[in-house]
A protein has these predicted regions:
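Eukaryotic tandem repeat interaction scaffolds
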Residues: 40-71, 77-82, 92
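Repeated scaffold domains used in trafficking and secretory/extracellular systems
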Residues: 1-5, 51-59, 100-121
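Hydrophilic extracytoplasmic domains
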Residues: 115-163
Length: 163
């Protein structure tokens, strides 16, 4: 169905609902509930500023602060958005790719360049910090790591991962 849901607790939740779809691309609105999903109200009619794709995920850490992801149909690129007002406004995260100083082990062997690293996984909480893994496509076993110490406002390159 394309709907992506996240519940912070038994009552409070958010969902991306498809409002239009064409050629594998979906366009969404963001809705919220305070009664466990019985009633939903629209928080944002166009959370991705006209961009379409596949809803990648929703994560909220309290009733205001969270991340929402949108990936391209090919799963080779994605965008992560941060909100600090429960989803009313979203800001696309821009990672400082020009600060990368280390590369994944097989990058050159596979013929990749830094420009190929456009798939951002949903952020993971690590204590007070948040990390994003950036890969060439969904499910990759190695890539770049960026960390935010200020709830997604600013990101710094912190290394590579290889599983």
């Amino acid at each position: 169905s394309g709907v992506v849901r996240f519940f912070l607790n038994e009552q409070k939740g958010w969902k991306l609902s498809v409002v239009d779809a064409a050629l594998g691309t979906r366009y969404y609105k963001l809705e919220t509930t305070s009664d466990g999903g019985h009633n939903w109200t629209t928080v944002n009619e166009d959370p991705f500023d006209g961009n379409g794709g596949a809803g990648e995920g929703i994560q909220f850490f309290d009733e205001q602060f969270g991340f929402i992801g949108l990936s391209g149909a090919s799963q080779t690129h994605s965008s992560i958005y941060v909100t600090k007002d429960g989803g009313k406004t979203l800001k696309e995260i821009e990672l400082p790719m020009d600060t990368v100083t280390e590369y994944p082990p097989h990058m050159q062997e596979y013929g990749f360049t830094l420009e190929d690293y456009q798939y951002l996984e949903m952020p993971q909480q690590d204590g007070e910090n948040y990390t994003i893994h950036v890969m060439t496509q969904s499910g990759e076993m190695e890539g770049l790591v960026f960390t935010s110490e200020d709830q997604g406002e600013n990101w710094i390159f912190t290394g590579v991962f290889a599983e």
